[in-house]
């Protein structure tokens, strides 16, 4: 039986108003669907989950819960800056599981919460020793003040061309890796697990 290749996409602070979900249509929160043609096209030929539950309304605990399949009370991660393998247990992650099944695992961007939350002081370290064949690329943005309250709308194309943000840099790094993964699959029959975590629509920093 041929193993399927896997593309695992993570968005940061994305609302549920996607066209593929017909907007947020639950009572008082009903809003019109956003214009999301690319996601909708992907959803039309994908398995779309219609029930999802937030384990915790904080980045690192919720990512840890998603990637390990365990609740924050099990991982013991309820805030940012703590590594679940040190506090909760040596739990297997989604990319680690596929890697152990023979998949080639590579990622870029904000998949895990980088830095101390993933076992290292550096933002680039994202559980590298366990989960990946190639340590994910997650580079900080160039040439911007460290500000968490600036909209993406404040950044024009000329500015972004001169000083790319993380999503642009991560995409540029990951595309050749996806080509390598496709080549390995074709020549060696090695399936791949590719994860990409975008910062949009979170504020750019």
Predicted regions and their residues:
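Formylglycine-dependent sulfatase
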Residues: 1-205
């Amino acid at each position: 039986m041929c193993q399927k290749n896997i593309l695992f996409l993570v968005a940061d602070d994305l609302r549920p108003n996607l066209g593929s979900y017909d907007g947020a249509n639950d009572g008082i929160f009903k809003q019109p669907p956003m214009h999301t043609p690319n996601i909708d096209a992907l959803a039309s030929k994908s398995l779309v989950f219609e029930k999802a539950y937030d384990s915790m309304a904080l980045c690192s605990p919720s990512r840890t819960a998603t990637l390990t399949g365990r609740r924050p009370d099990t991982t013991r991660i309820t805030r940012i800056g703590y590594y679940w393998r040190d506090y909760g247990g040596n739990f297997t992650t989604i990319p680690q599981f596929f890697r152990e099944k023979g998949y080639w695992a590579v990622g870029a961007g904000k998949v895990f919460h980088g830095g101390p939350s993933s076992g290292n002081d550096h933002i680039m370290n994202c559980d590298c020793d366990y989960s990946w064949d190639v340590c994910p690329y997650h580079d900080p943005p160039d040439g911007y003040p460290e500000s968490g309250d600036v909209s993406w709308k404040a950044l024009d194309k000329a500015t972004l061309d001169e000083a790319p943000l993380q999503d642009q840099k991560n995409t540029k790094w990951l595309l050749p890796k996806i080509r390598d993964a496709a080549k390995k699959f074709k020549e060696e029959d090695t399936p791949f697990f590719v994860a990409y975590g975008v910062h949009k629509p979170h504020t750019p920093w």
